[in-house]
């Protein structure tokens, strides 16, 4: 037997009636778990984005205290973990990227160009690169995929031309028939 639960949404405008949803117990449980998960993620993000929340030296001391043995005379097997620098808070949040981190330009040689890659079969070894238009988007494809696309387009065009010719012939035949009275 499936029991249903009435759920009232929060009202943002006092002039509007609240939204009422009829959910099964399982859907209600899933929705509650999702709300709890989202709330936890928001609090974690607020903590991580707050640069004044805790100094990195304090964090290192906390890590060292957790790894030290409680009795200094006994070696109870607790090993000191290597402490690596903790991640810095996110800065330069731009509207184009959800999370962008400041990057320093590298000195010396310019970066190597990325190898070309076929956007259909993902190969990067071909004697000839082609451009193909798929759904109004121009994409770079390898020679093999480009030839396959060309053959498909050619066969489709031939079929369309053949159908148009048949339709024209049928129309001519209909036009040539004398009208019987």
From Swiss-Prot:
SUPFAM superfamilies: Glucocorticoid receptor-like (DNA-binding domain). InterPro entries: Znf_NHR/GATA. Signal peptide: none annotated. It comes from the Eukaryota. GO terms for molecular function: zinc ion binding. A zinc finger (GATA-type) spans 118-145. The lineage of its organism: Eukaryota, Amoebozoa, Evosea, Eumycetozoa, Dictyostelia. GO terms for biological process: regulation of DNA-templated transcription. This is GATA zinc finger domain-containing protein 22. Coiled coil: none annotated. Gene3D superfamilies: Erythroid Transcription Factor GATA-1, subunit A. Keywords: Metal-binding, Zinc, Zinc-finger.
């Amino acid at each position: 037997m499936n029991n249903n639960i009435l759920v009232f949404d929060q009202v943002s405008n006092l002039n509007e009636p609240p939204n009422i949803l009829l959910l099964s117990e399982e859907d209600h449980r899933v929705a509650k778990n999702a709300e709890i998960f989202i709330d936890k993620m928001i609090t974690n993000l607020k903590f991580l984005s707050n640069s004044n929340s805790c100094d990195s030296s304090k964090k290192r001391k906390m890590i060292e205290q957790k790894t030290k043995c409680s009795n200094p005379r006994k070696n109870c097997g607790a090993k000191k973990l290597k402490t690596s620098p903790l991640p810095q808070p996110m800065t330069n949040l731009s509207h184009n990227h959800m999370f962008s981190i400041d990057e320093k330009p590298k000195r010396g040689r310019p970066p190597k160009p990325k190898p070309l890659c076929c956007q259909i079969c993902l190969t990067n070894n071909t004697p000839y690169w082609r451009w193909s238009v798929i759904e109004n988007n121009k994409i770079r494809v390898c020679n093999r995929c480009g030839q396959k696309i060309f053959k498909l387009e050619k066969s489709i065009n031939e079929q369309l031309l053949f159908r148009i010719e048949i339709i024209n012939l049928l129309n001519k035949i209909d036009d040539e028939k004398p009208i019987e009275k």
